[in-house]
């Protein structure tokens, strides 16, 4: 039995609004990532120096071989240069933001996968979420995800997705959500454990293949394991719940780490002042701070700022999208819903809010 919920068909005015908003947000994201974060603080000379000398400013060697395929390895070097300074453990704030943003992006990857599977069960259709996730790997979430949400808004009109037709596919989605939640740690582990330079940089490089691995998880679940070997989901929306919970854990880890750092500084600035300072350094780009020399922290600080812009743009993208997913359910007044989504973003994280919004919309729209 299906609960009848009024469908939200977008008017021309709404189409224009979403096109302008998410198109503009994508443009702002691209500008923030590639024209601000990576175009100052002597970032370009620092990258050029690493490429020419094969060493970072602190003397760390640059590994250039990851797959033994020269043409492919050349494409992976920029990611290694970008992330290496964030994973050395030099600054705990880097680790906290890495966990937060990558758990958020993994939740989005799951939302893309479920959306694709609800529309088509063909194996070839999995190229679509793979494309979007690879696109994100190379151009940044602040640019790519608003474009994806714009496309989803235009094509689905915020209507509930159709249920995935087969039990095998539904069960495989649940397994993909559970295993996929750990995918970011295949490259984040050097931030937690002592590792050699080569191991750390190879982990960074090979994580570029995570989108392909994530899609392969779904294929393996559907084609190889079989429905009888996979736990049956209790709800069509269970994968969203898993992804949202994983994103929440990542966000709570970042907030808990920030609170711990603030406690160490509280004797100098007071508890509230210390917490405010740590959260600003964790999430807000320090646009006024410029670097005038090529020191070892130039690239790491630029990469951290890059991820900070990712977080801010994703918040601006996810809150209105989640609102329009939930609005037809009439769960609360518009004002109360907006306040709830903002508070949810603060305390659960943007990735969790979007995944949970999808879950609530689908769970209430489709009776299992």
Curated annotation (Swiss-Prot):
It is a multi-pass membrane protein. GO terms for molecular function: isomerase activity. Disruption phenotype: Strongly diminishes the production of asperlin. Induction: Expression is controlled by the asperlin biosynthesis cluster-specific transcription factor alnR. Its main location: membrane. The chain crosses the membrane at residues 5-25, 79-99, 138-158, 173-193, 210-230, 241-261, 311-331, 335-355. GO terms for cellular component: membrane. Keywords: Isomerase, Membrane, Transmembrane, Transmembrane helix. Part of the gene cluster that mediates the biosynthesis of asperlin, a polyketide showing anti-inflammatory, antitumor and antibiotic activities. The first step of the asperlin biosynthesis is the production of the intermediate 2,4,6-octatrienoic acid by the highly redusing polyketide synthase alnA with cleavage of the PKS product by the esterase alnB. 2,4,6-octatrienoic acid is further converted to asperlin via several steps involving the remaining enzymes from the cluster. Belongs to the membrane-bound ascI terpene cyclase family. This is Terpene cyclase alnG. The gene is alnG.
């Amino acid at each position: 039995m299906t609960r009848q919920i009024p469908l939200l068909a977008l008017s021309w005015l709404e189409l224009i609004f979403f096109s302008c908003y998410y198109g503009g947000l994508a443009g702002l994201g691209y500008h923030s990532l590639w024209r601000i974060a990576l175009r100052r603080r002597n970032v370009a000379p620092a990258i050029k120096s690493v490429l020419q000398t094969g060493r970072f400013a602190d003397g760390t060697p640059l590994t250039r071989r990851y797959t033994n395929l020269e043409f492919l390895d050349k494409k992976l070097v920029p990611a290694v240069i970008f992330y290496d300074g964030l994973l050395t453990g030099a600054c705990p704030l880097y680790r906290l933001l890495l966990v937060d943003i990558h758990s958020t992006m993994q939740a989005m990857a799951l939302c893309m996968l479920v959306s694709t599977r609800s529309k088509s069960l063909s194996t070839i259709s999995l190229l679509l979420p793979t494309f979007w996730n690879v696109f994100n790997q190379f151009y940044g979430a602040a640019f790519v995800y608003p474009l994806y949400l714009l496309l989803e808004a235009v094509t689905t009109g915020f209507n509930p997705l159709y249920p995935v037709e087969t039990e095998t596919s539904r069960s495989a989605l649940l397994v993909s959500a559970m295993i996929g939640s750990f995918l970011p740690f295949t490259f984040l582990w050097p931030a937690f454990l002592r590792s050699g330079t080569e191991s750390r940089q190879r982990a960074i490089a090979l994580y570029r293949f995570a989108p392909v691995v994530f899609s392969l998880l779904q294929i393996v679940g559907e084609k190889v394991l079989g429905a009888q070997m996979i736990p049956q989901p209790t709800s069509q929306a269970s994968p969203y719940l898993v992804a949202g919970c994983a994103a929440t854990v990542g966000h709570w880890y970042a907030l808990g780490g920030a609170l711990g750092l603030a406690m160490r500084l509280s004797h100098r600035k007071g508890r509230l002042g210390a917490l405010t300072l740590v959260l600003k350094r964790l999430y807000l780009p320090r646009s006024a701070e410029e670097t005038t020399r090529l020191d070892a922290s130039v690239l790491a600080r630029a990469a951290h700022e890059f991820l900070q812009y990712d977080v801010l743009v994703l918040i601006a993208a996810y809150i209105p999208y989640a609102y329009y997913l939930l609005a037809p359910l009439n769960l609360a007044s518009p004002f109360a819903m907006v306040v709830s989504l903002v508070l949810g973003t603060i305390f659960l994280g943007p990735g969790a809010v979007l995944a949970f919004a999808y879950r609530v919309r689908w769970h209430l729209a489709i009776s299992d």
